[in-house]
Amino acid sequence: MNFTEPSPLAQSTVVGFLPELESLTPVPSNETSCENWREVHHLVFHAANVCFAVGLLIPTTLHLHMILLRVMLSIGCTLYVVWATLYRCALDMMIWNSVFLGINILHLSYLLYKKRPVKIEKDLGGVYHRLFEPLRVPPDLFRRLTGQFCVIQTLKRGQVYATEDKTSVDDRLSILLKGRMKVSYRGHFLHNIYPCAFIDSPEFRSTQMHKGEKFQVTIVADDNCRFLCWSRERLTYFLESEPFLYEIFRYLIGKDITNKLYSLNDPTLNDKKVKKLEPQMSLSTQISMLEMRNSITSSSDIEDGLHHFLRGSSSTASLPMSSPQQRASPKMKPIEEGLEDDDEVFVPVSPAHQLP
């Protein structure tokens, strides 16, 4: 058997590596390498972390939650930059915290810009405080609504806003700012329109189902009037992109149509009186509103239905009648507005429930 003897060069190489291998001491994997803890950092470091903790503990229900959070984060990043520069001498920590500080300052500036007081024009202040502010519409959103595609127009006394069977209802939607307008149909006076009320809300609702219609009434300025006028098409596109404002308009227009129905029953009723009488409308008012709705909806022609209601109202108004509060029986239940059918208003009593 042949044996190969190691060369002297290989032996010297192995012997040379032995001292280096002996100097290496492996670290067990189940023990920590932090045997000696370093000293506690400077107070500035702890103050920065306290600011971060306070910012994260701010409740989200607080109105200025995001602003306070960004303020505390900005203060904390500033203290970190000071600590890394003066006490740690760490360039990388200073750079990263400077970047975080810049981001927080930019976001804080944006939040403060959004919270700035928005100035509303004097002519539009009454409309905002009366209609939109109670529904929590922000001033900046109202300014967007009234600043892009609407104009303020004027009408002198006697000038016509819309003529029945001639003026298209597809062009505009308006709110009266100042003055008073008179609405009539075939020469019959219907009701007045007062400030902070929509001029053509029924027509706006009808055009959502049918296009190309004409005004069924004539609207004339009974005084020098100023009104806010939107382009119907552009307003529709804007409301489609703002679901919140879309629901606000649906509510306001529905309420305005209801007030106009009350005014049909009493032409001298203004907006303030309607607001006071809404919780306690008399029985005759509710009956006349149901008659008007049924007359219009049951007729194939809207003009014939409204004309039939006007003739019935004028004939009944000429008869001497006592106060409805005096004639109404205390056992009679009030009629709900949601009932649209006359057959559902008065329900016959079953013989089983009649007294012997």
From Swiss-Prot:
Residues 313-356 are annotated as: Disordered. GO terms for biological process: cell migration involved in heart development; epithelial cell-cell adhesion; heart development; hematopoietic progenitor cell differentiation; positive regulation of locomotion; positive regulation of receptor recycling; regulation of cell shape; regulation of endocytic recycling. Signal peptide: none annotated. GO terms for molecular function: cAMP binding; structural molecule activity. GO terms for cellular component: bicellular tight junction; caveola; cell projection membrane; lateral plasma membrane; membrane; plasma membrane; sarcolemma. Disulfide bonds: none annotated. Residues 93-115 are annotated as: Required for interaction with CAV3. Residues 136-186 are annotated as: Required for interaction with KCNK2. Cell adhesion molecule involved in the establishment and/or maintenance of cell integrity. Involved in the formation and regulation of the tight junction (TJ) paracellular permeability barrier in epithelial cells. Plays a role in VAMP3-mediated vesicular transport and recycling of different receptor molecules through its interaction with VAMP3. Plays a role in the regulation of cell shape and movement by modulating the Rho-family GTPase activity through its interaction with ARHGEF25/GEFT. Induces primordial adhesive contact and aggregation of epithelial cells in a Ca(2+)-independent manner. The chain crosses the membrane at residues 49-69, 71-91, 93-113. Residues 70, 114-356 are cytoplasmic. It comes from Rattus norvegicus (Rat). This is Popeye domain-containing protein 1. The keyword Transmembrane helix applies. Keywords: cAMP, cAMP-binding, Cell adhesion, Cell junction, Cell membrane, Developmental protein, Glycoprotein, Membrane, Nucleotide-binding, Phosphoprotein, Tight junction, Transmembrane, Transmembrane helix. It comes from the Eukaryota. Strongly expressed in heart and skeletal muscle. Weakly expressed in brain, spleen, liver, kidney and lung. It is found in: Lateral cell membrane; Cell junction, Tight junction; Membrane; Cell membrane, Sarcolemma. Belongs to the popeye family. Homodimer. Homodimerization requires the C-terminus cytoplasmic region. Interacts (via the C-terminus cytoplasmic tail) with TJP1. Interacts (via the C-terminus cytoplasmic tail) with ARHGEF25/GEFT (via the DH domain). Interacts (via the C-terminus cytoplasmic tail) with VAMP3. Interacts with KCNK2; the interaction enhances KCNK2 surface expression and is inhibited by cAMP. Interacts with CAV3. Residues 313-323 have a biased composition (Low complexity).
